[in-house]
Amino acid sequence: MTAIQLIVGLGNPGAEYEQTRHNAGAFFVERIAAAQRVDLVPERKFFGLTGRFTHQGQDVRLLIPTTYMNRSGQAVAALAGFYRIPVESILVAHDELDLPPGVAKLKVGGGHGGHNGLRDIIAQLGNQNTFHRLRLGIGHPGDASKVSGFVLGRAPRAEQEKLDASIDFALGVLPDIFAGEWNRAMKNLHSQKA
C-alpha cells in the first residue's frame, strides 16, 4: 500500500453546521490534529484548514475543506496537486448513511454512493476514485426525503457518543494505516462497534 500523505475530513463550514452529522469527517481530522499537537490553520490557496506532522520520517498533511461539502474536491485537488500527492496516498474521512452510529469502515476506491463531497472529490481528481476512505456511520433516517435534514442536523447525545467511539476506534488503527498494513487496519477496525 502507498503511504498515506493526506488525510481529509469532510464537513461544512460555519457555526450552524459545526456539530452536525455531516461533519463527522472533520471531527476525525480535528482529533488527529489534537493528538499530534498540530494547529489547523486557514490556507486560502487550499480552500481549507491545513496542518502537517511527521510520522516515522514521512510528512502527513491534514485538510478540512472550508468550502461547502459539494465543493470539497476543490480543496483536495488544490492541496494534492501542489504537493504532488498521488490519489492512492489520500485518505478521506466522511459521514456514512449506510452504517449505523458507532461503526467505522475503511474502503479503497469505489463510487460516491450519493455523497456530494465524495462526488466532487472524484470529479476534481479527474474521475480518479482510488483514494482511501474512512466511512463513519451516522445511520439513516429511513426515508430518502429526510436525508438532507438528517445529515445537517445534530445527533442526540447517545448517537454522538457512538460516533465519537467510532472515531476513537479509527484513531486506534492509524498506526497500521501509516505502516501500510491496510488489511490489518481493516480487520481491527471492522471488528469494533460501539
From Swiss-Prot:
It catalyses: an N-acyl-L-alpha-aminoacyl-tRNA + H2O = an N-acyl-L-amino acid + a tRNA + H(+). Its main location: cytoplasm. One of its GO terms (molecular function) is peptidyl-tRNA hydrolase activity. GO terms for biological process: protein quality control for misfolded or incompletely synthesized proteins; rescue of stalled ribosome. Its EC number is 3.1.1.29. The keyword Iron-sulfur does not apply. The record marks 95 as: Stabilizes the basic form of H active site to accept a proton. Transmembrane segments: none annotated. It is found in: Cytoplasm. The record marks 12 as: Discriminates between blocked and unblocked aminoacyl-tRNA. Keywords: Cytoplasm, Hydrolase, RNA-binding, tRNA-binding. InterPro entries: Pept_tRNA_hydro, Pept_tRNA_hydro_CS, Pept_tRNA_hydro_sf. Monomer. Belongs to the PTH family. Hydrolyzes ribosome-free peptidyl-tRNAs (with 1 or more amino acids incorporated), which drop off the ribosome during protein synthesis, or as a result of ribosome stalling. Catalyzes the release of premature peptidyl moieties from peptidyl-tRNA molecules trapped in stalled 50S ribosomal subunits, and thus maintains levels of free tRNAs and 50S ribosomes. This is Peptidyl-tRNA hydrolase. It comes from Pseudomonas syringae pv. syringae (strain B728a).
